[in-house]
A protein has these predicted regions:
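Function-determining surface determinants
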Residues: 1-472
Length: 472
């Protein structure tokens, strides 16, 4: 994690510095700075090899980065680096774009490090431009920052900046181009729809890079969420989009979502059953033997997903999704209209579908009915989230309530899925210990599924109250 700052003058003094480093880096990118446009990076540092930088969606001044260090000489990037960066590069060739000289001094504030950087752009070994920064960094979540921020401001830090070093040194051509687009109440339909689709397309690409890196299972989850949100946005905005264009994109996103879901669903089930087994004291070895089949299914599903994501056809799909997000096929008669006038009724339609489905449920709703209610809640939440950049806190509060309802229904659905899987496992088990473990866990999941049939009513009641809907 990190937060960057501009400096007026840093006054913590040499004796306070606990670390001093001098080094040079060679940065690689495409001629149109495709990596920089995504806040990603590829650099070589003599003596330390190659570093790949992947970032998730920037939220405010901080962003979460994943670094992958690879061995190799300076003449060309390792194949693994290009593989990890393929969602950004989409087969474009990379070359050297900048040589930088770094002078870094660091001071520790508890678990955090404040790094003062003086970075120079070198042309034929001569410094032609300079940038000065302080980065507040942590190896884990960026917490406990208040004392460090106070000390930094006292030392001369003046304000935050989200402009990366390469953009500051090389100019706007190296600036990020896939960040959030600001909207307000006066934004047009074209601006709002484009911003929503770009947001989801960008989240998909960023998280596909995390999927390829492989160490964080959250990458698959977030890529799937981005895929679903993109697809849901196309459905929500369908009345203002060309029908054939929308249908084709939704079909392609549906296929990708299936591949992502095959991995994510097995990961969720594994995590859930292991946690239930630990909570009930089920013997660990028996649990792992029970779950070995599921582990194998996850490995197979991930292998299939990776082969899809690395394919040339998928690279072409990403290009189409990004192009479609940047230039959606809007109906000419609606594109210039005020977004709030047009999109609010579309969100209202999604809400009415959810409300009708909820009101149709009797006192003993079935699992399938609750699953359909969860899907409706999810679609409504995505529609409301599209209004947050336009209307602010009102839709955000409703989206949070919808999220609570969705999570409650999601837990009930996960319990049903887990129970069904365990029931099959009991039927095929020949080992008594495995059968016993499966039976115990089946009982746990059926209890949770039964409880979930009533648990959703409380968040639904909170959501259905008129309070909080004044922005409509």
């Amino acid at each position: 994690m990190g937060i960057a700052f501009r400096l007026r003058q840093l006054r913590w003094g040499r004796t306070a510095a606990t670390r001093v480093e001098r080094f040079e880096t060679i940065h690689w990118d495409t001629p149109d700075f495709r990596l920089a446009s995504w806040d990603a990076g590829l650099r070589y540092r003599r003596g330390r090899g190659w570093r790949v930088t992947l970032t998730d969606w920037p939220e405010g001044p901080g962003c979460r980065r994943t670094y992958v260090d690879l061995e190799g000489g300076p003449s060309s990037p390792p194949a693994e680096a290009l593989r990890l960066l393929s969602p950004y590069l989409r087969y474009a060739e990379v070359g050297q774009v900048a040589r930088l000289r770094h002078l870094e001094t660091g001071r520790q504030f508890g678990e955090l490090w404040a790094i003062h950087q003086v970075v120079s752009l070198l042309v034929e070994r001569h410094a032609v431009a300079h940038a000065r920064r302080v980065s507040l960094r942590s190896h884990g979540p960026l917490t406990g920052t208040r004392p460090a921020l106070a000390a930094l401001r006292k030392a001369g830090v003046v304000d935050t900046t989200e402009l990366p070093l390469l953009a500051e040194l090389l100019g706007p051509e190296a600036a990020p181009r896939w960040r959030g687009t600001p909207l307000d109440r006066d934004s047009s339909v074209a601006q709002a729809v484009t911003a929503a689709l770009r947001d989801n397309a960008a989240r998909l690409v960023r998280n596909e890079a995390i999927v390829l890196e492989g160490s964080d299972p959250e990458g698959v989850h977030q890529a799937r969420v981005a895929c679903r949100r993109y697809r849901s946005a196309l459905q929500t905005f369908a009345p203002v989009l060309e029908p054939a264009w929308t249908a084709e994109l939704r079909d392609e996103l549906g296929t990708l979502g299936t591949d992502l879901g095959a991995v994510r669903d097995t990961e969720v089930l594994l995590t859930r059953l292991r946690a239930s087994a630990a909570a009930r004291g089920v013997e660990g070895e028996a649990t792992e033997r029970l779950l070995s089949r599921l582990v194998g299914e996850r490995v197979l599903a991930r292998d299939v997903l990776i082969s899809v994501v690395e394919s040339h056809e998928h690279g072409e799909l990403l290009q189409r999704l990004l192009a479609a997000a940047s230039h959606p096929a809007l109906l000419p008669e609606t594109a210039g209209q005020p977004a709030s006038d047009v999109l609010l009724p579309l969100m209202g339609a999604s809400w009415r579908k959810l409300a009708r489905r909820a009101h149709r449920l009797d006192d003993h709703p079935g699992d399938v009915d609750l699953h359909q209610l969860r899907i409706a809640a999810k679609k409504c939440r995505y529609a409301v989230l599209a209004l947050v950049p336009l209307l602010g806190d009102g839709p955000a509060r409703i989206a949070a309530r919808l999220g609570t309802l969705q999570d409650t229904l999601g837990d009930q659905h996960d319990a049903v899925v887990a129970g069904n899987w365990l029931q099959e496992a009991v039927g095929r088990a020949t080992d008594p210990e495995i059968a016993f473990a499966a039976g115990v866990l089946y009982g746990v999941e059926r209890e949770r599924a039964d409880a979930g049939r009533e648990a959703w009513r409380e968040p639904w009641a909170a959501l259905a109250r008129k309070k909080g809907w004044g922005w409509m």
